[in-house]
Amino acid sequence: MAIERYNPRDAEPRWQQKWNEDKVFVTDNSDPREKYYVLEMFPYPSGRIHMGHVRNYAMGDVVARYKRARGFNVLHPMGWDAFGMPAENAAMQNKVHPKDWTYQNIATMRGQLKSMGLSLDWTREFATCDVEYYHRQQALFVDFMEKGLVYRKQSKVNWDPVDHTVLANEQVIDGRGWRSGALVEQRELTQWFFRITDFSQDLLDELDELDQWPEKVRLMQKNWIGRSEGLSLRWQTVADTAPQGFSDITVYTTRPDTLFGASFLAIAADHPLAKELSATNPAIAEFCDECRRHGTSLAALETAEKKGIDTGVKVVHPLDPSWELPVYVANFVLMDYGTGAIFGCPSGDQRDLDFARKYGLPVVAVVAPEGPDAASFTVEDTAFTDDGVMINSSFLNGMKTTDAFEAVVQKLSAQSLGNAPQAERKVNFRLRDWGISRQRYWGCPIPVIHCEVCGVVPVPKKDLPVKLPDDVTFDVPGNPLDRHSTWRHVSCPQCGHDARRETDTMDTFVDSSWYYTRFTAPWEDEPTDPQVANHWLPVDQYIGGIEHAILHLLYSRFFTRAMRETGHVGVKEPFKGLFTQGMVVHETYSRGEGLTREWVPPAELRIEENDGTRRAFLLSSGEEVKIGSIEKMSKSKKNVVDPDDIIASYGADTARFFVLSDSPPDRDVIWSEAGVEGANRFVQRVWRIIGEAAEQLKGVKPKPATEGEGLAASKAAHKTLKAVQEDLDKLAFNKAIARIYELVNALAGPLADVAAGGKPDNVKAAARDAVEILIRIIAPMTPHLAEECWSALGNEGLVAETPWPTFVASLVEENDVVMPVQVNGKKRGELTIARDADQDAVRTAALELDAVKSILAGGEPKKVIVVPQRIVNIVV
């Protein structure tokens, strides 16, 4: 019989309410079942969720629902990464308080996420701007401080003189602030740091144990930590060329084997020697100031033009005292890396080669590819950076680079300069301590008091939290906490004298570096309940974007180590499994060119397709607009699809199904209206074929068939169940969905026959069993549809609380095997035959293949070799 179309606008809110009333997804920490903690990176409350959120949280929800059905006690929480600059920018632009802006956005986005039907434990929800959360973060800071994991030091920062704030390197564009356009200044500010470098080697070593992380992410972290083994080498300065007190310059190098190719030394603009020379040399001072006006990130240095200035200082080559090299200040050397000084070997480093060509410095090839022409090898436009054989290198000539490395290390380590060895082996790390100070209001206050008598004093825990004041204004640039009339003034907790609060707040990466531990017991007075945290941690499956591969994930790994040192957790690693999903991308549409180009949202367009050509027209005027490239959905390009619109038109299950089904989960998914409509047709088809057969299946006890009419449906269902189970274990959502499509196709006919009536009980029992398997394997992806179908069959209870089905082994075994048939070693065909067929039967069947018969032409083969269930080889 015909049934009404599935109506998600009616069904989805109804089942969401039922799940909520029955507290289906509220997790009990005392539940004795095996735990499974699944977590998606929590969102910044920017205003509305986007399709990237839908994909991310749909993936996590599939994992949570699947693991719950498999019998695990699942923890699947949600919160908000709520501090940060966007709220302050909104405050300045819209005259709204950051707190109000943030909590309004949270309310909107919470409603959107709930409309997706996510199996979240909302009782554990928090925002990082909640006083209750940052109170515990301040307690952690105090504990870290007591453990020696926090310190203050003068640090160079990018200062925007218009916005009165520190800028990250990435926010400095061509020497100017990204928002104000002002020329950025390099300033020395006293900053707070976490000692992440205390754990450099451990953070590196433990990467090998994270075998459920993408290899790409582990490699990115390995490179960021940047362990290198090299030589710390002192170069003697030539008398009368260097200021007093600078008798030598220390350089760290990983390529001491290339020393005979050195043609210059380069030091950073903030090297002590550069500062000393700047005091008396205006040209050097001006050049150093220019270096400080540009971004200090490695990326900025890589792309910037290589510049330098000869200081007039010269150094003696450590392996040849007759050889003197010039010392330059160079814009590509950073004080924060190594010693702030390098030696340049132009033939072995492209940056050094470009610099040498620009300033007319010698280029001596010292490493050549192995071969008979090695001695005559030269370098012109491209440096030779590979290993090879040493040339033009005195006693090193003919050695391989690895042997030359050791020879130089041994020689210089035994050589004295002054009263100490001229060189020593050293392990260096690229990783630097984490500067957490931010000169802004909307962040977690650093719980420290500055007293002229006692110095720096941590706020006693009994006086925590240090709350942000609400009565602040954003009418002038800068940090409102600096100019607050009362908040910053406080008595010293040690001596009682007048003192002042720290007005810097914490980097928002701090907030997201420990939130996963707080979810385990968010009601506790302490940051964690260690026993509960140790039960749940590490997170079994963490899901988020590849853009967080380094900073967020590395900082989180530091935090678990620091929290372990201070007794809050017992684990080292925060995340056992990591999955980085692809983005949701969409075509771009625009009208006009150049400066007059205007981006057009897809909702304002009509798309027409004729003979494979797609054209876009404005709905309002019919004007044709240009279809551009497919890019990440962004507000700037207006190629954004609002999830609310999709859910209102098609339902949450359709949106979920599309973002899960269209491509492998680690790749980008291209949003298309046709794809969404296809997903919706599938949802409607599942409802139709089950709904039409539901009356005939009510009251029928499910039982798979072992023979006869129902066998095909039972085999299809149980084989699909086994395959989907394997796919979901590997997070291969798109593969699981492809198999479900096939199962629906396989069941459509048998269910139509059942719906027509007159089928015997055993056939209906097999159909009921197959349908219940279908419903339960679609439940993680399309949970509302699954509940509606489950209810239509007359089942009591919820699919969300129903165990995962078990496949029948005999129904998933293949009784036949496919064996390739070769003639004289060349494949000529395939043979499908019973798995238990004897060799004579296989031999006879192989000889009956048409391709084999034509080759034999009535003759007999010399030999037939049968490898059981594998291959047949016929020799003629």
Curated annotation (Swiss-Prot):
One of its GO terms (molecular function) is leucine-tRNA ligase activity. The keyword Transcription regulation does not apply. One of its GO terms (biological process) is leucyl-tRNA aminoacylation. Transmembrane segments: none annotated. A motif ('HIGH' region) lies at residues 43-53. One of its GO terms (cellular component) is cytosol. It is found in: Cytoplasm. Keywords: Aminoacyl-tRNA synthetase, ATP-binding, Cytoplasm, Ligase, Nucleotide-binding, Protein biosynthesis. Belongs to the class-I aminoacyl-tRNA synthetase family. This is Leucine--tRNA ligase.
